[in-house]
Curated annotation (Swiss-Prot):
Keyword vocabulary terms for this entry: Carbohydrate metabolism, Glycogen biosynthesis, Glycogen metabolism, Glycosyltransferase, Transferase
Coiled coil: none
UniProt GO molecular function: 1,4-alpha-glucan branching enzyme activity; cation binding; hydrolase activity, hydrolyzing O-glycosyl compounds
Residues at the active site: D417, E470
Subunit and partners: Monomer.
Any one GO cellular component localisation term in the record: cytosol
Listed pathway(s): Glycan biosynthesis; glycogen biosynthesis
Catalytic reactions on record: Transfers a segment of a (1->4)-alpha-D-glucan chain to a primary hydroxy group in a similar glucan chain
The family this protein is said to belong to: Belongs to the glycosyl hydrolase 13 family. GlgB subfamily.
Protein name: 1,4-alpha-glucan branching enzyme GlgB
Keyword set includes RNA-binding: no
InterPro entries: A-amylase/branching_C, Branching_enzy, GlgB, GlgB_N, GlgB_N_E_set_prok, Glyco_hydro_13_cat_dom, Glyco_hydro_13_N, Glyco_hydro_b
EC numbers: 2.4.1.18
Length: 738
């Protein structure tokens, strides 16, 4: 090398900068690498650790713009390639031990972010941030590749690493957008299917564990933890008519009967393999449609490393789990659900996240997504971390995620998990383990604001969708609109009803008279919220056994109790939710590691419960009185529940306009109630449309025939009455003929 070259004014001579660059610890690599205009002309600087030589070439002719000088043994090259400062199109040619290869220079491509996107990201108000952050395959200047972008404001350096660069953090050190904290780079040649993570150096120089992409759209099949380049799901949707008309399908006046399903254990192949999304559509949808459920609710589909969490400890909020297929496969599953007339609700977990090293925990070396103080940021019940809802960027990340599932996957609603843990700062904490809010109270004001903002965005941008709160306290106005001071959810799980009624049903019939109010208490508050009655997965795990296993008595009585209870539930005010397996009275506790016990359907007693659920869904949908006023006090009247000694309940459901009333009589003792007179709103013909004791369901067939004639004899404060045979451990449903 000549002395003149040594003294070239365009050379980078700062050994500290070069040392930081080759060590992969330079905060702003774009300030050094790539083409740079100088007084002497166009200088090109390249870092390629494996190369012996480097030169810039014309991509069309292959002619050389000039060889680059190797300035550092670890692969830093530099050279003046033109006296002109205009940047030509070029490629890089490298050699190593006789091998030659060409590649594009990632550092010649400018940022693809617009000023508005950067402003909204910086403000934490970008509701479609998933269109900018994450991995997006695209073409820049005619070159195919992938743009990677991630939020890590406290990092001193971020690189994207993957199988496209041998997981070498020196190769693709990213561009920082100052003041916003977003790092970005376009990597030529990176394509869908490539694995990647982010290699991050914290503010104090510490190298963090490689991180999966918080906005990654696909992940490796667990237990592997890398993100997969996929881009936003591409789908030719065929559900336009469904989406256009779904406003009435998710409304509080609509019949909503939800089949809760864990996709990994509903059915499996004989060798234990999961069904794919397509196979689930082939087998699950006809089954659900035949049973008459209006919706399925999928336990969390967001990617999660630990199957034993059932999805409630997600790491990849933007990625449908790869256990069952690709993002496009999941989109097709939703599309097929809609084609069959079935709505799709997914469980969504914004309350907390796991502490897995590859996840969000201390993402950039600081408590970025969580709180630093464990009194705010750590959940002892689940050993998980709690989102910092007061940080605008974090709240935006979550709100955008909620909208993402509705926008990109056309889901019809979100069931928000563990809302109670979000609302209260002292949730599951002892004195001294929590910090009061600014008013000295225990409400998490930041979480409340986040939920209101998310629900407002959801209903505003996707009319006809809904949100459902799993909320176990008496927090007021959960399903009240935000403009009326509520949290803005569409519905709330009625946990109180579930606990009270299951407690009642577990008592031996002879003792139920002492717990009579367990079945009536729920009507005191039944219309304070838009309630869903949930018999969810939580009731068949952790040693609770199965629903049928919690019923008292011998085998016949257990089934009779369950049938009577289901009939009570389906005719009680509130939308319905039943966890898979309950529809045929699975006897063992649910196990996420294996499929349901489908052989039960060969047993007439189990098949009878299955057929009862089908008929309950049918009358629930067909009789407006059973669903139109689920959430209104005008839709329910007690006829008689005044005699605890016989454990009977008689009530009426009403609809709007000319809807015919429905009268229900329940007997929760094993004694046949002959000549059981009930009051009715009018005389005439009343028809028994369902009897849980019907022999078709495995009952003793104490029924009332097709029709029941009434008399004008007043009873129970009603102008007419009828005499029934009330079956043992049975419920009867009557409708008045016009």
């Amino acid at each position: 090398m000549s002395a003149a070259a040594d003294a070239a004014p365009w050379r980078l001579d700062d050994p500290h900068v070069i040392g930081a660059l080759v060590a992969g610890r330079l905060a702003d690599p774009f300030a050094i690498l790539g083409p740079h205009q100088t007084a002497a002309g166009l200088v090109l600087r390249v870092l390629r650790p494996e190369a012996d030589t480097a030169e810039a070439i014309d991509p069309d002719s292959g002619s050389s713009y000039g060889k680059l000088l190797k300035r550092h043994a670890r692969g830093f090259f530099e050279g003046l390639i033109s006296k002109n400062t205009a940047v030509p199109r070029y490629r890089l040619r490298f050699t190593r031990e006789g091998d030659t290869w060409d590649e594009e220079d990632a550092y010649r491509f400018p940022s693809t972010f617009g000023d508005l996107d950067l402003y909204l990201l910086g403000e934490g108000r970008h509701q479609r941030l998933y269109e900018k952050l994450g991995a997006h395959p695209m073409a820049c200047d005619g070159v195919d590749g992938t743009r990677f972008a991630v939020w890590a404001p406290n990092a001193s350096r971020v690189s994207v690493v993957g199988n496209f660069n041998n997981w070498d953090g020196r190769r693709h050190q990213m561009r920082l957008h100052p003041g916003i904290g977003v790092w970005e780079i376009f990597v030529p040649g990176a394509k869908p299917g490539n694995l990647y993570k982010y290699e991050i150096i914290g503010r104090n120089g510490e190298l963090l564990p490689p991180k999966a992409d918080p906005v990654g759209f696909r992940a490796e099949v667990p237990p592997a933890t890398a993100s997969v380049v996929n881009g936003l799901p591409q789908m030719e949707w065929g559900d336009g008519e469904w989406v256009e008309h779904r406003i009435g399908k998710n409304d509080r006046k609509a019949p909503i009967s939800i089949y809760e399903v864990h996709l990994g254990s509903w059915r499996r192949h004989e060798d234990g393999r999961y069904l794919s999304y397509d196979e689930l559509a082939d087998r699950l949808l006809p089954y659900v449609k035949d049973l008459g459920f209006t919706h399925i609710e999928c336990m969390p589909v967001s990617e999660h490393p630990f199957s034993g969490s059932w999805g409630y400890q997600p790491v990849g909020l933007y990625a449908p789990t790869s256990r069952f297929g690709t993002p496009e496969d999941f989109a097709r599953f939703v599309d097929r659900c809609h084609h069959e007339g079935i709505g799709v609700i997914i469980d969504w977990v914004p309350a907390h996240f796991p502490s897995d090293a590859h996840g969000l925990a201390r993402f950039d070396g600081t408590a970025l997504y969580e709180h630093e103080d464990p009194r705010l940021g750590f959940h002892r019940d689940w050993n998980t971390l709690i989102y910092n809802f007061g940080r605008r960027e974090v709240a935006n990340f979550l709100t955008a995620n909620a909208l993402f599932w509705l926008d990109r996957y056309h889901v019809d609603g979100l069931r928000v998990d563990a809302v109670a843990s979000m609302l209260y700062l002292d949730y599951s904490r002892q004195p001294g383990e929590w910090i009061p809010n600014k008013h000295g109270g225990n409400e998490n004001l930041e979480a409340i604001a986040f939920l209101r903002e998310t629900n407002t965005a959801l209903f505003g941008s996707h009319p006809g969708t809904t949100s459902i709160a799993e909320e176990s306290t008496a927090f007021p106005g959960v399903s009240r609109p935000v403009y009326a001071g509520g949290l803005g959810f569409g519905f709330k799980w009625n946990m109180g009803w579930m606990h009270d009624t299951l407690d009642y049903m577990q008592h031996e019939p002879i003792h139920r008279q002492h717990h009579h109010d367990r079945m009536t208490f729920g009507l005191i508050y039944a219309f304070s919220e838009n309630f869903i009655l949930p018999l969810s997965h939580d009731e068949v795990v952790h040693g609770k056994g199965s629903l049928i296993g919690r019923m008292p008595g011998d085998r016949w009585q257990k089934f009779a109790n369950l049938r009577a209870y289901f009939t009570f539930m389906w005719t009680h005010p509130g939308k319905k939710l039943l966890f898979m397996g309950g529809e045929f009275a699975q006897e063992r506790e649910w196990n996420h590691d294996w499929q349901l016990d489908w052989h039960h359907l060969d047993d007439p007693m189990h098949r009878g419960v299955h057929d009862l659920i089908r008929d309950l869904n049918r009358i629930y949908r067909s009789e407006p009185a059973l669903h139109e006023l689920d959430c209104e006090p005008e839709g329910f009247e007690w006829i008689d529940a005044s005699d605890p000694s016989i454990s009977t309940y008689v009530y009426m459901r009403k609809g709007t306009g000319g809807a015919r009333p429905v009268v229900v009589a329940c007997n929760f003792t094993p004694v046949v109630r002959e000549n059981f007179r009930i009051g009715l709103p009018n005389a005439g013909i009343w028809r028994e449309i369902l009897n849980s004791d019907d022999r078709r369901y495995g009952g003793s067939d104490v029924t009332n025939g097709t029709v029941t004639a009434t008399t004008d004899e007043p009873w129970h404060g009603r102008p007419a009455s009828a005499i029934l045979r009330l079956p043992p451990l049975g419920s009867v449903v009557l409708v008045g003929e016009a």
